[in-house]
Amino acid sequence: MTSVLELKATARPKSGKGAARAERRAGRVPGVIYGDNQSPLPISVEEKELRLRILAGRFLTTVFDVVLDGKKHRVIPRDYHLDPVRDFPIHVDFLRLGAGATIRVSVPLHLKGLEVAPGVKRGGTFNIVTHTVELEAPAENIPQFIEADVSTLDIGVSLHLSDIALPTGVKSVSRDDVTLVTIVPPSGYNEDKAAAGAAPAAAAAPAAAAKAPAAAAKAPAAAAPAAKKK
């Protein structure tokens, strides 16, 4: 079950750049609640509280109850903008969640068993192809992260999204079987592997040559042709 956090907001009676700048000077961040076939609702939230929520992580996969004039609006953040210089939030968008809503989310990928993977023990290196997974999930069952067990991966082996059991009701939005992680061989691995394969063949050649004279020596001499009768 998705945990729901509460966020207090106030209505924003005026729109436009001038009104937005006034909100920011007052220590508030302008935003909007939209979706679910309802009219957009301009709001503002306290900048300090919003910044803490963003810094806590997983902001875009967290469901909130935005409290506005005593009424709760079930939402999920869809986007936010940061000041390019001072790096604090200057705008936020919330998507209104209706009953039974299903949404697309980008969920972090957590890897388990990195240190014990056979490929790592043999000198390979993990190449994490993607750090997030694009999923479609019920609003009440959004996973905070997806865990992938890589403890059995060897050199040259990849883990795909189809190798992971997703939570009930959650599915990938990609038509392709996304590669999540692979183990890259160490430098010179292919050359060493080829040399190792060639060594037994090279050793077998002299042995085969040595067996040939011995086999010839053991072979019985050919019988002389019988004399013709006169």
UniProtKB/Swiss-Prot annotation:
GO terms for cellular component: cytosolic large ribosomal subunit. Pfam families: Ribosomal_L25p, Ribosomal_TL5_C. Keywords: Ribonucleoprotein, Ribosomal protein, RNA-binding, rRNA-binding. GO terms for biological process: translation. Disulfide bonds: none annotated. Signal peptide: none annotated. Part of the 50S ribosomal subunit; part of the 5S rRNA/L5/L18/L25 subcomplex. Contacts the 5S rRNA. Binds to the 5S rRNA independently of L5 and L18. This is Large ribosomal subunit protein bL25.
